[in-house]
């Protein structure tokens, strides 16, 4: 039998601080990922061909816009609508379900990016691996469509699992003679089972990401040993490409593990222990991780860095023109 601890009330100051931090995280995450999306989308508008990596980054940034929006809605629900002494309301459960699906799509896209780096950077010697790398490079658009299809399938299965257990809850209520406490526990456990189901579907892309990232790491080590033997030039383009790719992949791995741990810990905090402060901390960590990886992607991509430099130069020149105009106005006065 499940035993629930006492419900921790949250002061107005804590809720206000959490909401302020959530607004900042949403603003930073939205701006960074919208920047990546707009830079790549502008190339599409100008009818310039997008590289495979740019296509993946475009899809990845769009999926993270949804992630940040859902996490911000979750923060609003926690601070204003959801009382942990009551069962989770329907709107909050829908937000959590959509977040699980968007997070899984994000993982599939990261696995696709890792495979793309492998196909471009690793020099394979086996015929099968050479053909596989060539196939990945040629079929990247189909892989992206496949990711969307897998996300849709996962959505249907998660919704089926969730509402199927909801039917079990309704049937249970009829036979429990209005035992509301047990009904609340079963309703909350429905979300937990759906959460576990989504995480099981995340195992294949996560393993794919780990294998391809491991192959890229081995390739980097082999390339560095070759450089020590045959050349003294430390500025090798292939080496720099390896390092930049690994930085983006390792940073994603770290941020994803941290975010997943926070999400997993938040479930018992939300359902069993009703610790709203703990849930707020977990939501804050989950919102910060995609923003951090977006910053790493911008710093490691030459086109995005050039766009940032252009924007900063434009802002600097605009401020200078405005300051000169104000100085001229004062002189005339």
UniProtKB/Swiss-Prot annotation:
Keyword entries, A-Z: G-protein coupled receptor, Glycoprotein, Membrane, Receptor, Sensory transduction, Taste, Transducer, Transmembrane, Transmembrane helix
Coiled-coil positions: none
Glycosylated position list: 178
Cytoplasmic side: 39-55, 116-142, 212-251, 298-333
Residues that span the membrane, as ranges: 18-38, 56-76, 95-115, 143-163, 191-211, 252-272, 277-297
Compartments it resides in: Membrane
GO molecular function: bitter taste receptor activity; G protein-coupled receptor activity
Entry-linked Pfam families: TAS2R (PF05296)
Major site of localization recorded for this protein: membrane
Topological domains annotated Extracellular: 1-17, 77-94, 164-190, 273-276
Anything else known: Most taste cells may be activated by a limited number of bitter compounds; individual taste cells can discriminate among bitter stimuli.
Role, per record: Receptor that may play a role in the perception of bitterness and is gustducin-linked. May play a role in sensing the chemical composition of the gastrointestinal content. The activity of this receptor may stimulate alpha gustducin, mediate PLC-beta-2 activation and lead to the gating of TRPM5.
Name this polypeptide is given: Taste receptor type 2 member 38
Organism encoding this protein: Papio hamadryas
Taxon lineage: Eukaryota, Metazoa, Chordata, Craniata, Vertebrata
Originating gene: TAS2R38
């Amino acid at each position: 039998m499940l035993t629930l601890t006492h419900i921790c009330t949250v002061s107005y100051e804590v809720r206000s601080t959490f909401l302020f931090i959530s607004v900042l995280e949403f603003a930073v995450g939205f701006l960074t990922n919208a920047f990546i999306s707009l830079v790549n989308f502008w190339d599409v508008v100008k009818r310039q061909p997008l590289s495979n990596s740019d296509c993946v980054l475009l899809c990845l940034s769009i999926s993270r816009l949804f992630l940040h929006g859902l996490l911000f809605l979750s923060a609003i629900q926690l601070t204003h609508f959801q009382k942990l002494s009551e069962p989770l309301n329907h709107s909050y459960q829908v937000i959590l379900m959509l977040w699980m699906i968007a997070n899984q799509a994000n993982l599939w896209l990261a696995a696709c990016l890792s495979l793309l780096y492998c196909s471009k950077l690793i020099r394979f010697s086996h015929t099968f691996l050479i053909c596989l790398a060539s196939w990945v490079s040629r079929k990247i658009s189909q892989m992206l469509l496949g990711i969307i299809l897998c996300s849709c399938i996962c959505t249907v299965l998660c919704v089926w699992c969730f509402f199927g257990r909801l039917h079990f809850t309704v049937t249970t209520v009829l036979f429990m003679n209005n035992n509301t406490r047990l009904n609340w526990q079963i309703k909350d456990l429905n979300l937990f089972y759906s959460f576990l189901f989504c995480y099981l579907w995340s195992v294949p892309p996560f393993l794919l990401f780990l294998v391809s990232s491991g192959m890229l790491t081995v390739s980097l080590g082999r390339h560095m040993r070759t450089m020590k033997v045959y050349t003294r030039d430390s500025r090798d383009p292939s080496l720099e490409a390896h390092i930049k790719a690994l930085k983006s992949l390792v940073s994603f791995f770290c941020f994803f593990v941290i975010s997943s741990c926070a999400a997993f810990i938040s479930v018992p905090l939300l359902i069993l222990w009703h610790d709203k402060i703990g849930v707020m901390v977990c939501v804050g960590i989950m919102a910060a991780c995609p923003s951090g990886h977006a910053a790493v992607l911008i710093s490691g991509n030459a086109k995005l860095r050039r766009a940032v430099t252009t924007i900063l130069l434009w802002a600097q020149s605009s401020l200078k023109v405005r300051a000169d105009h104000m100085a001229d106005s004062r002189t005339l006065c």
